[in-house]
Design a protein with these regions (language model features):
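Short, ordered loop/turn segments at secondary-structure junctions
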Residues: 17-20, 56-57, 93-98, 103-104, ...
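Hydrophobic alpha-helical scaffolding
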Residues: 31, 67-71, 110-113, 121-129, ...
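A conserved regulatory-domain signal marking ACT and ACT-like small-molecule sensing domains
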Residues: 156-325
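Hydrophobic anchor at the start of a short beta-strand
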Residues: 12-13, 89, 146, 210, ...
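Phosphate/diphosphate-binding glycine-rich loops and adjacent basic-rich segments that engage nucleotide
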Residues: 53-54, 86, 113, 122-180
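Alpha-helical scaffold segments in soluble metabolic enzymes
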Residues: 3-7, 40-44, 79-83, 97, ...
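Structural signal for hydrophobic packing residues in well-ordered secondary-structure cores
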Residues: 6-9, 45, 49, 84, ...
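Nucleotide/pyrophosphate-binding catalytic subdomain
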Residues: 1-136, 305
Length: 325
């Protein structure tokens, strides 16, 4: 890119992460940016050079090259925008912006002109692929306006920024889905304090991220059942960990299932409008889709359903919430 700009008679210089430097911690493969020293690049810019910075990489405080992991390039762009107090950070992708849902599944999905940081963060964390959660969280922390644009089409894209007025116009902003889900159920766990801490603490030691959790009374008196979801890619590790601690926990039965999908609706209007959960659950019921697990946040409702129904669920919910208008 730097060479191409030079051929257009534009002065440009390329920078590796260590040359900037972009300082990170030592977690190789998923390093976290700690600081960006701006003096070198700023001096180059003042001399008329366009700065081309490699994403996805940094250097630790003991001078080891690190990589930032998934979403590292977008995160680098946002971090640079924050460090230089830029008015906006533009992210060019293979799509024209952020859509109400996956347009490959719902043909009438609409491109959003605007979405808040919180909504985008929820959509990204629940399976939307446009941006990774790290870049959105960083933009939200430093109040960097983000714009998602297409590399192939000259269209306005989607602006991601702080909440604006008239946020009650739509009940929800978007629908996300995650196919990388596994459901685990532990049955007949002795009902006593500390059991959940023991189970999830053991999983955390092996970096297994637990998402949706449901605990209910067992048919056997004095026992409880616990169901939770994890990334399907972590299922084998989770099975080994749980079998290892079975003696300490005392559960009677372990079951796992992978043919499940998480569907999430997201919108700031949930803070002030009632009936959104009702609409979601009634829509799924009318289409004979059984809900296995439910989890909520202030602006999100997620349900776990059988994978054979996820496309039907997304299309039905998109229609029910008038997102195609």
């Amino acid at each position: 890119l730097s060479i191409a700009l030079e051929e257009l008679s534009l002065k440009a210089r390329s920078w590796m992460g260590w040359q900037v430097p972009i300082v990170s911690d030592n977690t190789h493969g998923k390093a976290v940016i700690k600081d960006i020293k701006t003096s070198n690049i700023m001096g180059s810019i003042k001399n008329g050079y366009i700065a081309i910075v490699s994403g996805f990489q940094g250097i630790s405080e003991d001078n080891r090259i690190t990589t930032l992991g998934r979403g590292g390039s977008d995160t680098t762009a946002v971090a640079l925008a924050a460090a230089f107090s830029a008015d906006r950070c533009d992210i060019y992708t293979d799509v024209e912006g952020v859509y109400t849902t996956d347009p490959r599944i719902v043909k009438k999905a609409k491109k959003l002109d605007f979405i808040t940081y919180e909504e985008m963060l929820e959509l990204a964390s629940q399976g939307a692929k446009v941006l990774q959660t790290r870049s959105v969280a960083l933009a939200m922390k430093y109040k960097v306006n983000l714009r998602v644009l297409s590399s192939f089409a000259n269209v306005p894209g989607t602006l991601i920024a702080e909440e604006r007025g008239n946020m009650e116009k739509s009940e929800i902003s978007g629908i996300a889905h995650s196919l990388n889900e596994a459901k685990i159920t532990l049955s007949d766990i002795p009902d006593q304090p500390g059991q959940a801490a023991n189970i999830f603490g053991a999983l955390a030691e092996f970096s297994v991220n637990v998402d949706m959790i449901v605990q209910s009374s067992s048919i056997n008196h004095g026992s409880t059942d616990m169901t939770f979801t994890i990334p399907e890619t972590d299922l084998l590790i989770a099975e080994k960990v749980i079998k290892k601690i079975k003696g300490n926990i005392g559960f009677k039965k372990f079951t796992s299932e992978t043919n499940v999908v998480k569907i999430s609706i997201v919108g700031n209007a949930m803070r002030s409008q009632s009936g959104i959960a009702k609409t979601m659950f009634q829509t799924l019921a009318k289409n004979h889709i059984n809900i296995q697990v439910i989890s909520t946040s202030e602006i999100k409702i997620s349900v776990l359903i059988s994978s054979e129904y996820y496309e039907l669920a997304m299309r039905s919910l998109h229609l029910a919430f008038n997102l195609d208008k």
